[in-house]
Amino acid sequence: QYNELLASIANTIQDYRGGSLPQPIPDHVERWVQQFDAAVQLPILQEIDHVLKKIYFSKEDVAKFLRGAMRTQKLTGDRPDKFWRSASFLDIQGGGSSQTDMLALFSEQLEDEHGFGIDDCGQGDEVFIYLDDGIFTGNRVRRDLEGWIGGNAPAQAKVHVICIAEHSGGRYYANTKIQEVIRASGKKIDITWWHAIELEDRKTYSATSDVLRPTAIPNDPAVQAHVAAMRYPPTL
């Protein structure tokens, strides 16, 4: 079963970062899992295999999601070609390259669907698209949009935040902070959030959460030292 799991995980992630993982990938996965004690390696592989099969998005999965968003009438209205022509794509991410990668992939799908890419868009001045792969803590999208709202954003705008995976708590946090900045700016800016999957991580819903939270701090010196050094104590 051990080798089967290595092969299964490798097959799922074979296109990760454009296929840049060291080959053969099963050996790479094995080197990764060997950092853990031998007794827990099999359970870890079982869980990783299970989770990745449910939430790993291959490049084709991402392209399919973007094509779906492109065709969503609730987003575009009756004339999707006109909507996308008028929309402006924000390239304002303060760190990393995920937004640039998503914009390039979206442009490819737009070209296939309507015959033009994002460089031919932006003919209007009211609709703006913020693309990214995921919203986790919400800090990235929050800071990006806060800076834009306080700077280049027009007095009135509609912003669509489109991402693959969205953590409920991260979106709630980001949206709350962004709304504060909008009010302070005096601008009229509406934010709408779109996602392929939503992961529940709000503490209020810990019993049905999609993330695992500790219920107790083990009596282990290394763990206790780590917890003591945390800026905010964990919620148990």
Enumerate the predicted regions with their spans.
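Short acidic low-complexity segments
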Residues: 114-125
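Ser/Thr-glycine-rich phosphate-binding loops at phosphate-binding pockets of nucleotides
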Residues: 131-140
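A glycine-rich, hydrophobic loop/mini-helix early in the fold
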Residues: 88-104, 108
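Short, well-ordered alpha-helix to beta-strand connector turns
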Residues: 125-126, 156
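PRPP-dependent phosphoribosyltransferase catalytic core
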Residues: 1-86, 95-99, 146-236
